[in-house]
Amino acid sequence: MANYFEMTRDELTAEKAALEENYKKFQAMGLKLNMARGKPGPHQMDLAMGLLQMTDYTTDAGTDARNYGDLEGLHEARELFGDVMGVKPEEVFVGGNSSLQIMYNLISMGYCFGFPESPCPWSQVEKRKFLCPVPGYDRHFAITEEFGFELISVPMTPTGPDMDVVEKLVAEDDTIKGIWCVPQYSNPDGYTYSDETIDRFAKMKTAAPDFKIFWDEAYIVHHLTDEIIETPVLLNECKKYGTEDRVFMFTSTSKITFPGAGVSAIACSESSMKYICKRFSVMIISYDKMNQLRHVRFLKNKEGVLAHMAKHRRRLVPCFDAVKTAFRNNLIPCGDIAHWTDPKGGYFISLYVMPGCAKRVANLCKEAGLTLTGAGSAYPYHKDPQDSHLRIAPTYPSLDEVETASELLCVCVRLAVVEKLLAEQA
């Protein structure tokens, strides 16, 4: 392999022919590979099968978990999530299996009713806006798009969103009602917000009195190294500045136990807790407390969660390493055609290919039997201005499948880049 940017047109043409020949070999294999979504693989979910042996239905206080009641969640479950999230049990609301559903419910709540500090429901705010760090989580963006918010992109950095941009925007525009954040091992870059970034979120001035930070701790215990990274707890930091009502923290066991049968939680201020309980009480009497109790009995406490996640780590690290090894071996020798993140946790690797090539790479992969998240999906309205970013999710396939998929992906990246370089020389 040689640097593509130093090749003559004849050399690039020969390289294209060789890559096309290799690509056809992958097509002939009849592959059905998927690295599109951040799903746990069967080997991870198998680790939690002990949950199904938890048949106890009586809480430590003698409550029958089979019955109605305890809208905020079982006390034991609130203690468990408070331990994991670093907050008090009374600041935790434990819900059903989907934290995304609770996020949707809270956006809907703001839209229909507003929050206690809102001058009016968000639905009555013309040209309402929401900040979206990019690249970010497509399902977050879809919720606020569904409710008619204009989505404003904010650049991500290795220490979190560009806070100079965030602070300027929220200080000047009272129609900006919130921001989406994945503060630990962000989706998709795998970045963790710095202490300074978290402090700035807590103390920043906002023109909107009802500005909300949707703080999604989806990967709070999803470490890929022996280093257990812990960051300041935003809710606790906000208390120092009297801004605790601006934050909703979320987490769930979706990528700890069973994605379709886990438990989710919100952490928020006392005032916010009273308000959301009032609104939720009209919608539901209680969530699945039997499942909450099963999770408490199985995971026990934060130490139990971390011990369980260490088993996940041992199974996931080889898959992440396989992707990065393929990138190093197959892309670096070709020159500056791509770069990628090296996350210490989470579920994704961000691959940035030469601008103008991401859609072509994704299409080439699809035609050879490898499904990736659509190019541009990590940006509002699925529009990546550079057409450069691809989110790689190596968690669900087997290690052999990840290795094959990574080799195919590299062929597709190189082929797309060579095609573009030849087109530019035409």
Residue spans of the language-model regions?
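Short amphipathic alpha-helices in soluble, non-transmembrane regions
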Residues: 361-367, 405-410
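Short, solvent-exposed loop/turn segments at secondary-structure junctions
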Residues: 38-42, 99-100, 136-138, 159, ...
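Conserved core of the PLP fold type I
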Residues: 63-209, 220-242, 410, 414-425
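N-terminal "arm"/small-domain region of PLP-dependent enzymes with the aminotransferase-like
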Residues: 2-72, 76-83, 367-370
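Conserved glycine-rich beta-strand-loop-beta hairpin in the small C-terminal domain of fold type I
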Residues: 310-324, 336-352, 366
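Conserved core segment of the aminotransferase class I/II
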Residues: 123, 236-317, 330, 418
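Conserved PLP-binding active-site segment of the aspartate aminotransferase-like
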Residues: 350-355, 372-414
